[in-house]
């Protein structure tokens, strides 16, 4: 019960932050064609921890990099579930999915199994250093809900920012399909 109440409070705080920072900040992200900043972060998948490196992930194909405000809040859990439910679709497009928030790695270990269903890596970005590089910081302690599709050449192929988690999966899948069609 306390976790539910705490999650509700965090959700309300994030909503209040969105209101206070204004529309411009909520919709900011790196531009199409920009070079994606390289990074390496500790990440969890299925409760196991390893380093996730953008350069290594891009060697295998495009990367869907999505930032979210806080693990175990309702919107972030919903978004993680949606990504996990569609992981086979991402794999068909040879894409790697990586989730990122400012939560510590111990929290991400649990989130990777419970919310992400062990389907993809979820990284810990303490201090939101990587979120800042990607113009995905909502407030001091929270990343914005921003999704990127990074082409294999390391450029931003698609960017989408919206605190409503519902469209991030469909939009990134559509962007990957367009990217795949353009390569043919």
Regions found by a protein language model. Give the residues of each.
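Short active-site neighborhood of thiol/selenol oxidoreductases, capturing the structured segment around
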Residues: 54-83
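Bacterial N-terminal signal peptides
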Residues: 9-17
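N-proximal helix/coil linker or "cap" segments that precede and/or mark the start of modular domains
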Residues: 16-43
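Structural microenvironment flanking redox-active thiols in thiol-disulfide oxidoreductases
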Residues: 77-116, 126-132
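Thiol-/selenol-based redox modules, centered on thioredoxin-like
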Residues: 143-184
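Short loop/turn microsegments at loop-to-beta-strand junctions
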Residues: 37, 62, 144-146
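A short beta-strand-turn-helix
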Residues: 40-62
């Amino acid at each position: 019960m306390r976790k539910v109440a705490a999650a509700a409070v965090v959700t309300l705080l994030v909503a209040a932050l969105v209101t206070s920072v204004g529309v411009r900040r909520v919709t900011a992200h790196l531009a199409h064609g920009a070079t994606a900043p390289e990074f390496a972060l500790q990440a969890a998948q299925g409760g196991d921890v390893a380093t996730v490196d953008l350069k290594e992930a891009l060697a295998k194909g495009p990367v869907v990099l999505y930032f979210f405000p806080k693990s175990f809040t309702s919107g972030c859990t919903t978004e993680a579930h949606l990504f996990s439910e569609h992981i086979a679709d991402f794999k068909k497009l040879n894409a790697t999915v990586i989730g990122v928030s400012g939560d510590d790695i111990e929290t991400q270990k649990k989130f990777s199994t419970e919310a992400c269903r062990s389907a993809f890596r979820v990284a810990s970005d303490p201090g939101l250093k990587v979120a800042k590089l990607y113009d995905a910081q909502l407030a001091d302690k929270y990343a914005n809900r921003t999704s990127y599709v990074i082409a294999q050449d390391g450029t931003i192929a698609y960017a989408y920012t919206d605190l409503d988690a519902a469209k991030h999966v469909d939009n990134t899948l559509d962007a990957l399909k367009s990217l795949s069609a353009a390569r043919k």
